[in-house]
């Protein structure tokens, strides 16, 4: 039961920080400009530096090359979950301004702030390489395919909406966080190390990413009258996609793809994590339905109190 308690600690920390943003916003600390500033600060400054630091510190050239075969499972499972989400969005007639968020939520998870401590509690430090591998694929897909989905909801030009690499979409997709991620990968592949003072500075600023993202979710939640938070099909299906479809896609592909037993266990746990906190930030930045994104993120965190420990016990017993 100790590993379950450790997982709950991570979830309670998230709820607490979201609560701070919620309470301060209700007390008038933040206006529309403040929340936009937080979104911009995270997207343009702290998150790109966080990407560079996290990749540079957790990978080296040899480790990245050696673990390359294990990349196949997270890549295929996320693409499968994305396909299921896209079909579900059309079959169940998800609102147009929510479809990108809805589909992204199906295959993108909070793999670091919750995922890392959960896997450390369950499998120990030997799980860190697999955790970071899933994180790398998760991050790549979020800042390309995920952002593309969210951007599509904001484009009025029908021609632009039909082309992945349209000028309007590409300008938004090639964001500072994606640039930071690419820089981190290049540094690892070239076996380059930044000077310690620079890495320390990047880490200090990068550490702002998670708390600011969670405070932002609290701010967005405070703008929604509690009585108006309806559990409509868009929300319920989004939750089902996050906690059911994504992990099932991983489990369905395990017998058919080359992967170590430990990586299979870690990837399954990573797929069960709540929604990515930066999803609400991106929705705000690009003019999508940020209230829906914030509500979906917050709800998956709350439900994670029950769902994540349940999956931990199942994985520990059967996989």
Indicate where each model-derived feature is located.
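Alpha-helical transmembrane segments of multi-pass small-molecule/ion transporters
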Residues: 1-319
């Amino acid at each position: 039961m100790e590993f379950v308690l450790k997982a709950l600690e991570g979830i309670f920390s998230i709820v607490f920080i979201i609560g701070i943003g919620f309470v301060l916003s209700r007390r008038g600390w933040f206006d529309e400009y403040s929340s936009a500033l937080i979104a911009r600060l995270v997207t343009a400054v702290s998150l790109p530096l966080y990407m560079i630091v996290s990749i540079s510190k957790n990978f080296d050239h040899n480790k990245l090359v050696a673990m390359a075969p294990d990349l196949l499972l997270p890549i295929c499972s996320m693409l499968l979950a994305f396909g299921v989400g896209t079909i579900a969005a059309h079959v169940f007639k998800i609102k147009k301004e929510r479809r990108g968020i809805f589909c992204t939520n199906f295959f993108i998870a909070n793999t670091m702030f919750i995922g890392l401590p959960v896997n450390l509690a369950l499998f120990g430090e030997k799980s860190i390489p697999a955790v970071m591998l899933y994180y790398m694929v998760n991050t790549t897909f979020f800042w390309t395919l995920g952002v593309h989905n969210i951007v599509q909801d904001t484009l009025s030009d029908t021609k632009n909406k039909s082309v992945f690499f349209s000028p309007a979409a590409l300008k938004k997709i090639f964001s500072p966080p994606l640039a930071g991620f690419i820089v981190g990968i290049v540094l690892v592949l070239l076996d380059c190390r930044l000077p310690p003072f620079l890495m320390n500075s990047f880490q200090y600023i990068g550490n702002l990413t998670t708390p600011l993202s969670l405070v932002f979710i609290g701010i967005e939640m405070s703008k929604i009258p509690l009585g108006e938070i309806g559990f409509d099909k868009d929300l319920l299906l989004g939750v089902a996609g996050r906690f059911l479809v994504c992990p099932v896609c991983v489990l369905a592909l395990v017998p058919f793809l080359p992967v170590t037993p430990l990586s299979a266990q870690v990837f399954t746990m990573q797929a069960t994590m709540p929604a990515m906190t930066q999803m609400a930030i991106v929705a705000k930045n690009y003019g999508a339905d940020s209230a829906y994104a914030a509500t979906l993120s917050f709800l998956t965190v709350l439900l994670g109190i029950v769902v994540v420990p349940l999956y931990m016990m199942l994985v520990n017993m059967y996989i």
